[in-house]
Amino acid sequence: MSFPEGKDILLMGNEAAKAAEAFQRSLKKIGHRRTQSIVGDKIITVSETVEKPTISKSTKVTTPPERRNAWGEKPDTTRNQTEEARNEATLEDTSRLYEEVFAPTSDGKTPAEEGMETPEKPKKKVTFKNDESGRYTKLEMEALELLSDNEDDDAESSVLTFEEKDTSALSLEARLESIDEKLSMILGLLRTLNVATAGPTAARDGIRDAMVGLREELIADIIKEAKGKAAEMMKEEAKQKSKIGNGSVGLTEKAKELNKIVEDESTSGESEEEEEEEDEEESNPDDDLYSLTM
């Protein structure tokens, strides 16, 4: 038995590949045809085309079944009539609403425009009117505003200082306005003082007594504080006297001994120096500058 050689095996493999490709192509086509290989040789394929069966379409029209109630009653025949009536009613209602919304009122505005307007603020039920009758009411109000001004919150506010405001135009009118403002302020202060002191006699006496009592309390507090300081100074002086004595300073026994030793040493040193100087003068009498030789 002879085995095939390598060339024969390669040829058989190529033919098998070509046959497989032809079979795949034949499946994609509708009818049975003979295909050709890449080389050009005709190859008879074993594939057979199977024709698709024709599906007969029925021309019968199927109608949906009618709805029936569970209790076997007949369907309502008046449903279509009610739907038509409802549609007509909705059209009439919408037209009526359209006329009501867009119909102008007596003011010439439609209700929609009136609704878009901003609502008015509620009016106050009680209104307080300032009684402006009088000659100095305006000045009095200005003075009260100045007196009620809180200087702690506003560093620039001051009741008792009258500094001119920084005006860009240094004209005569600006100066007159500033002078008028100062005068109105002064008159307002005088008016408030007049009102405060123009009460009955009992009220004025009460104010005076209160001021006098306040003054006496302040004086008593000052005197009390001064007396307390003086008493503290006297106590401190007494403590110092008890420590020092009569004011004379005395030495202790050890201090006295040390002082005596120091004094002895100082006196002995001075005497020795004096003796040495005398001996030198006696030994050298010719060294005197004032001695003259004839």
Swiss-Prot record:
Region named Disordered: 52-97, 234-294
Region listing for Binding to the N-RNA complex, in residue ranges: 281-294
Role, per record: Plays critical roles in regulating RNA replication and transcription through its interactions with multiple proteins. Tethers the RNA-directed RNA polymerase L to the nucleoprotein-RNA complex. Recruits the M2-1 protein, a processivity factor that is required for efficient transcription of viral RNA. Acts as a chaperone for neo-synthesized nucleoprotein by forming an N-P complex that preserves N in a monomeric and RNA-free state and prevents the association of nascent N with host cell RNAs. Recruits the host phosphatase PP1 to inclusion bodies to regulate viral transcription.
A GO MF term: RNA-directed RNA polymerase activity
Region (Binding to monomeric RNA-free nucleoprotein), start-end ranges: 12-28
This protein's name: Phosphoprotein
PTM field: Constitutively phosphorylated by host.
Origin species: Avian metapneumovirus (isolate Canada goose/Minnesota/15a/2001)
Feature: compositional bias, Basic and acidic residues: 65-97, 253-263
Protein family per UniProt: Belongs to the pneumoviridae phosphoprotein P family.
Region (Oligomerization and binding to RNA-directed RNA polymerase L): 169-194
Modified residues annotated as Phosphoserine in this record: 106, 148, 157-158, 168, 171
Keywords (A to Z) from UniProt: Host cytoplasm, Phosphoprotein, Viral RNA replication, Virion
Coiled-coil residue windows: none
Taxonomic superkingdom: Viruses
